[in-house]
């Protein structure tokens, strides 16, 4: 799933689910088992020589789950030669593509697209969120230079230019619980940062467009229905008449201590009726079911097929390398999973329980990841050099009409040559400008003499865009707090794409 179904599933459940009312205040406070064998494991081993691994992530602050991740999962990560994610979380192209994906066509805005009543309710709710945000933020966030006005503008700025489906996801991420979690890298991003720090090769099996286009594929009537349900849910929450059926805390609890086949992770179609609000009128229930079926097919099953085939092609092209594939946990649970796809290609994929030893392939590095979280292990920032393997995949995908197949990636000679080119590129770049960190919250945009270039802001993976006045002769920069590490969302995946992304990307 900054991940689209991972991002999208919790948001969608929030809209459609009806569950017994309960408090989740202490739901994530499950006890840490001292015995490794008693920990949850989201690790699967692809049996070959050397072995490769699947690891299921969730899009929550990594500090909430790191201590509960078994040591053998961390060892598998350390020993792997190449780490693959759903999306390339460190590539500026990912950010700009996500930005473009969210925006309405030129000249359109939400006021012209949405029914008047829904537009007014949306505007009123965002005004409420802006008013409440200072009280939602923690002293620690303020101490790091993350302030309410800036955070609100970074997340919801220019909302009138966004497509309605992205506004719906944005609304679902503008809650007190999610605001309090901003400023700590989510698990996916933390692993990407660690892979870069350990100088591992990294890559991605998907492009942003492959996660993004299905969301934009909903017809307008379905999007308006979903946005209306989202606003109703939030309005009821504000009135105190309903509680969130599935919260981030519930997700964390199930990941740390729950059943791997928990309803939150399981995408089996038999679970769907539990997610549909039975109080809806019959016609609206049909619409809700159609939306659920559409996204299940587009964001889970089709993506699993595509991702599984690309994993298979990578394994075949690099038989001497050990891979660590970190995808949203939802891709490995339920029916028609990535694991099922690999098995159909003849691979033996086995779940690896906590406590089971990982065979040392002699090519990894030991004791490089902290087994326990501490404040000192929180990454300060991450540089974003070109991603060698991902770049070739991206170029090849663009040059092939059949995007269901993975094109040629890299041979060893190609990798060596590209590494040399990359080192030369870095040296030239360092002479031109100061080295930048991923946590800087801004992306340099080249000015155009013909087009107004949008400003891109990133807060915890939430991408916002606003046009700036055209100025010639120099680049424009978006200034931001540089002392905070931020996570980039997808369902998802999304990206995972935001903590709609952070909630439209949680399992992806």
UniProtKB/Swiss-Prot annotation:
Quote the cofactor binding remark.
Answer: Divalent metal cations. Mn(2+) or Co(2+).
User: What's its EC?
Assistant: 3.4.-.-
Please, one GO biological process term? head development
Give TM regions.
486-506
Q: Which GO terms describe its molecular function?
A: metal ion binding; metalloendopeptidase activity; Wnt-protein binding
Q: Any other comment in the entry?
A: Was named TIKI in reference to large-headed humanoid in Polynesian mythology.
Known glycosylation sites:
219, 228, 277, 335
Give the subcellular location.
Answer: Cell membrane
A single GO CC term, please? organelle membrane
The identity of this protein, by name, is Metalloprotease TIKI1
Give the keywords, sorted. Answer: Cell membrane, Glycoprotein, Hydrolase, Membrane, Metal-binding, Metalloprotease, Protease, Signal, Transmembrane, Transmembrane helix, Wnt signaling pathway
Topological domains on the Cytoplasmic side lie at 507-508
Q: Which organism does this sequence originate in?
A: Xenopus tropicalis
Tissues where the protein occurs: Zygotically expressed in the Spemann-Mangold organizer, in particular in the head Spemann-Mangold organizer region responsible for anterior patterning.
Q: What does this protein do?
A: Metalloprotease that acts as a negative regulator of the Wnt signaling pathway: expressed in the Spemann-Mangold organizer and is required for anterior-neural patterning in head formation in embryos. Acts by mediating the cleavage of the N-terminal residues of a subset of Wnt proteins. Following cleavage, Wnt proteins become oxidized and form large disulfide-bond oligomers, leading to their inactivation. Able to cleave wnt8.
Q: According to the UniProt entry, where is the signal peptide?
A: 1-23
Is NAD one of the keywords?
no
Q: Does the keyword Translocase apply?
A: no
Identify the residue ranges that face the Extracellular compartment according to the record. 24-485
- Where does it primarily localize? membrane
State the similarity comment: Belongs to the TIKI family.
Tell me the cofactors it needs: Mn(2+); Co(2+)
The way it spans or sits in the membrane comes to: Single-pass type I membrane protein
């Amino acid at each position: 799933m900054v991940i689209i179904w991972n991002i999208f599933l919790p948001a969608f459940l929030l809209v459609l689910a009806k569950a017994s009312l309960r408090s989740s205040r202490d739901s994530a406070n499950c006890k840490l088992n001292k015995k490794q064998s008693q920990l949850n494991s989201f690790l699967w081993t692809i049996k070959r020589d050397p072995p490769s691994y699947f690891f299921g992530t969730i899009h929550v602050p990594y500090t909430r789950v790191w201590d509960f991740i078994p040591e053998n999962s961390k060892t598998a990560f350390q020993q792997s030669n190449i780490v693959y994610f759903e999306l390339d979380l460190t590539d500026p192209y990912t950010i700009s593509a996500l930005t473009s994906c969210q925006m309405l066509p030129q000249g359109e805005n939400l006021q012209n697209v949405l029914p008047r009543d829904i537009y007014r309710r949306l505007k009123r709710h965002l005004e409420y969120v802006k008013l409440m945000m200072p009280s939602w933020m923690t002293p620690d966030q303020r101490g790091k230079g993350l302030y309410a006005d800036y955070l609100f503008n970074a997340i919801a700025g220019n909302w009138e230019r966004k497509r309605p489906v992205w506004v719906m996801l944005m609304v679902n991420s503008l809650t007190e619980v999610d605001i309090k979690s901003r400023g700590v890298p989510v698990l996916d991003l933390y692993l990407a940062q660690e892979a870069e720090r350990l100088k591992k090769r990294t890559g991605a099996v998907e492009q942003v467009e492959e996660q993004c286009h299905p969301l934009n594929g909903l017809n307008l009537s379905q999007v308006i229905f979903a946005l209306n349900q989202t606003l109703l849910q939030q309005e009821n929450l504000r009135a105190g008449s309903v509680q969130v059926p599935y919260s981030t805390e519930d997700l964390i609890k199930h990941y740390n201590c729950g059943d791997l086949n928990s309803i939150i992770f399981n995408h089996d179609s038999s679970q769907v009726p539990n997610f549909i609000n039975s109080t809806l009128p019959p016609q609206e229930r049909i619409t809700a079911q159609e939306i659920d079926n559409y996204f299940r097919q587009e964001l889970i099953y089709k993506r699993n097929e595509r991702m599984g085939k690309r994993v298979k092609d990578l394994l075949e092209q690099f038989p001497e390398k050990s891979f660590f594939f970190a995808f949203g946990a939802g891709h490995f649970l339920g029916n028609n999973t990535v694991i099922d796809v690999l098995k159909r290609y003849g691979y033996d994929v086995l779940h690896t329980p906590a406590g089971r030893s990982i065979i040392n392939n002699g090519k990894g590095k030991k004791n490089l990841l902290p087994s326990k979280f501490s404040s000192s292990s929180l990454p300060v920032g991450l540089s974003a050099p070109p991603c060698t393997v991902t770049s070739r995949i991206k170029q090849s995908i663009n040059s092939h009409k059949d995007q269901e197949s993975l094109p040629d990636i890299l041979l060893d000679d190609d990798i060596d040559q590209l590494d040399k080119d990359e080192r030369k590129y870095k040296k030239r770049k360092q002479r031109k400008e100061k080295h930048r960190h991923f946590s800087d919250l801004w992306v340099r945009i080249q000015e155009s003499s013909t087009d107004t270039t949008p400003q891109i802001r990133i807060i915890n993976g939430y991408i916002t865009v606003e046009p700036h006045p055209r100025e010639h002769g120099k680049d424009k920069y978006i200034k931001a707090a540089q002392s905070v590490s931020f996570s980039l969302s997808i369902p998802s995946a999304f990206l995972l794409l935001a903590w709609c992304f952070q909630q439209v990307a949680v399992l992806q």
